[in-house]
Amino acid sequence: MLMRDENAKVMMLMPVDSTKHFQARVYWNKYSRETYIDILSLPDPGEGKQYQLWALTAGNPVDAGIFILPNDAGMQRLKNIIEADQWAVTIEPTGGSLNPSLDQMILISKNS
């Protein structure tokens, strides 16, 4: 199980806007490249919008996948990621974007 795997990193994502109480956790294994997200608190992104996770390496974003707000979904498996120094979540049009909408960044992790 990824949470108990000693090779898995757990990264806490905190709100970009410190007045908000949004949170998520990313579980990432750099060897198997598996990536999961566990949503702790996020609002509905709005009509025609969806959340997207980004892996950041030297400031360059890589699409880690789009995800839905959980009802009973628990952790959601996203794309395999080769390398990441940091993680971010943006609100994007449904289906995701090739590049992050930086003005719509809602969560970010500290550097790993």
Positions of predicted regions on the chain:
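N-terminal targeting/export leaders
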Residues: M1-S112
